[in-house]
């Protein structure tokens, strides 16, 4: 039996993690975010009602679940307050269910200004960030000048630290990026206005998780973005600024790494990507348009149209290695309904003619990579909302089996629609 279960994306994000976390938290006592910030967009549909969460863990909708934002998350007070208000307006007592690590770095207005100034300066070479200040906040953390939630306990010292760091960043904004300076007093006033709310939710997260482990409580760790966006192992430099792989759980929450029991990789039945960067199986034809339309592939955070393509099992195998995956949850299988044939990328052809079955490590090595496909019959029957494996068309079952063969990982959960009820749990991670 697994008490500590990790749910993370195996592609470039947008795999459907939020729904699965919400579904599995029916048995969990805690749900923990351990990396990223409000650049995530987790969409839940419960009884037909849609909820989009960016910063707060997906377990917040469950009354018997405590949601935790761990130290690996960069926290925007403004974004958190906005999200809390939206949920509280719907009658959800967020402050009774949410806890924070005092080590969470804060995202403040100057981080957002820097993020957007840099993207503008890059021009055609822009990375395609969400413009929410995530990267600059992580930079401040690593440079040891960042302000953290715990700094809000001493407001006088916080004001002094803020003044110093803002002088540094405003110098960059004005003199290098030729942008406007960010107003110190406004940032201070805005942050002080919510300081007591934030500090009232602070706990020792590492200690709490260790006590939960000793009691045998079920804990769900909710990843954001996807494996191929990992700062170290992703398609650098077109990546996010945090460790999206399973290794980020220990560093971003304080749970000892030996205590992770099961890692569930969320795998979309096809591939998508937002923003710039390598995408070998990207489709520019009517099939790509079909996947975008049928899958409603528009970012929950940015509203940007996602790039679409066939499932890339070469890239997914890299995710298997990096995360030591225990099982997959296959999502959006129903989007492939109606296609006469479906394709799986099984290898890459490099510019020099070599065929490889692993992803390139250097950014430049992705250039000119061509996907090698295996083509399988599609299916005309609808899989939408099917709740039993026996109800799936044989061609869909063959597709599922082939994914398992190519990756070496079992598909333990199949999602056939956005609602939590439209799911087949073949093996529950908490029972594995």
From Swiss-Prot:
Cellular localization per UniProt: Cytoplasm
Query: Which reaction is this enzyme known to catalyze?
Result: IMP + L-aspartate + GTP = N(6)-(1,2-dicarboxyethyl)-AMP + GDP + phosphate + 2 H(+)
Q: Which InterPro entries match?
A: Adenylosuccin_syn_GTP-bd, Adenylosuccin_syn_Lys_AS, Adenylosuccinate_synth_dom1, Adenylosuccinate_synth_dom2, Adenylosuccinate_synth_dom3, Adenylosuccinate_synthetase, P-loop_NTPase
Q: What is its main location?
A: cytoplasm
- Source species of the chain: Salmonella newport (strain SL254)
One Pfam entry name: Adenylsucc_synt
Report what the protein is called: Adenylosuccinate synthetase
What are the protein's GO molecular function terms? Answer: adenylosuccinate synthase activity; GTP binding; magnesium ion binding
Alphabetically, which GO biological process terms does the record hold? 'de novo' AMP biosynthetic process; IMP metabolic process
Query: Which positions bind IMP?
Result: 14-17, 39-42, 130, 144, 225, 240, 304
Q: How is the cofactor bound?
A: Binds 1 Mg(2+) ion per subunit.
User: Catalytic positions?
Assistant: 14 (proton acceptor), 42 (proton donor)
Family recorded in the similarity comment = Belongs to the adenylosuccinate synthetase family.
- According to its UniProt record, this protein's enzyme class is ligase
HAMAP family membership: Adenylosucc_synth
One GO cellular-component annotation of the UniProt record comes to: cytoplasm
To which pathway does this protein belong? Purine metabolism; AMP biosynthesis via de novo pathway; AMP from IMP: step 1/2
**Which residues does the record give as GTP binding sites?**
13-19, 41-43, 306, 332-334, 415-417
Describe its function: Plays an important role in the de novo pathway of purine nucleotide biosynthesis. Catalyzes the first committed step in the biosynthesis of AMP from IMP.
Assembly and oligomerization:
Homodimer.
Q: Which residues bind substrate?
A: 300-306
Gene it is expressed from: purA
Q: Which CDD domains match?
A: AdSS
| Keywords tagged on the record | Cytoplasm, GTP-binding, Ligase, Magnesium, Metal-binding, Nucleotide-binding, Purine biosynthesis
Cofactor(s) the protein requires to work: Mg(2+)
Protein residues bound to Mg(2+): 14, 41
E.C. numbers: 6.3.4.4
Q: Which NCBIfam families match?
A: PRK01117.1, purA
């Amino acid at each position: 039996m697994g008490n500590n279960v990790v749910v993370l994306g195996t592609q470039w994000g947008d795999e459907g993690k939020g729904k699965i976390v919400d579904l599995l938290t029916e048995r969990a006592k805690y749900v923990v975010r351990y990396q990223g910030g409000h650049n995530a967009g987790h969409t839940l549909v419960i009884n037909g009602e849609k909820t989009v969460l960016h910063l707060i863990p997906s377990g917040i909708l469950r009354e018997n679940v405590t949601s935790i934002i761990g130290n690996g998350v960069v926290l925007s007070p403004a974004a958190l307050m906005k999200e809390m208000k939206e949920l509280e307006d719907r009658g959800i007592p967020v402050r009774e269910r949410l806890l924070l690590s005092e080590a969470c770095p804060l995202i403040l207005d100057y981080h957002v200004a820097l993020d957007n100034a840099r993207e503008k300066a890059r021009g055609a070479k822009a990375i395609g960030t969400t413009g929410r200040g995530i990267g600059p906040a992580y930079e401040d953390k690593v440079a040891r000048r960042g302000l953290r939630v715990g700094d809000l306990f001493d407001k006088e010292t916080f004001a002094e630290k803020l003044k110093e760091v803002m002088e540094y960043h405003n110098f960059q904004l004005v003199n290098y990026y030729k942008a406007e300076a960010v107003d110190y007093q406004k940032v201070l006033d805005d942050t002080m206005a919510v300081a007591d709310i934030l500090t009232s939710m602070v706990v020792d997260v590492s200690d709490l998780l260790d006590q939960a482990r000793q009691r045998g409580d079920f804990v769900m760790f909710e990843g954001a973005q996807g494996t191929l966006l990992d700062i170290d192992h992703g398609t650098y430099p077109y990546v996010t600024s945090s460790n999206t792989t399973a290794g980020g759980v220990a560093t971003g929450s304080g749970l000892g790494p030996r205590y992770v029991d099961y890692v569930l990789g969320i795998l979309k039945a096809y591939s998508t990507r937002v923003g710039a960067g390598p995408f070998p199986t990207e489709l520019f034809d009517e099939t790509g348009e079909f996947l975008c339309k049928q899958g409603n592939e528009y970012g929950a955070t940015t509203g940007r149209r996602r790039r679409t393509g066939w499932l890339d099992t070469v890239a997914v195998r890299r995710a298997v290695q990096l995360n030591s995956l225990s099982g997959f949850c296959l999502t959006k299988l129903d989007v492939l309904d109606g296609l006469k044939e479906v394709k799986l990328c099984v290898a890459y052809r490099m510019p020099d003619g070599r065929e490889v079955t692993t992803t390139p490590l250097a950014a430049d090595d992705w250039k000119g990579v061509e996907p090698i496909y295996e083509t399988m019959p599609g299916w005309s029957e609808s899989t939408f909302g099917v709740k039993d494996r026996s109800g799936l068309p044989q061609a869909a079952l063959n597709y599922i089996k082939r994914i398992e063969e190519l990756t070496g990982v079992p598909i333990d959960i199949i999602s056939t629609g956005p609602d939590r009820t439209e799911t087949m749990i073949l093996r529950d991670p908490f029972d594995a």
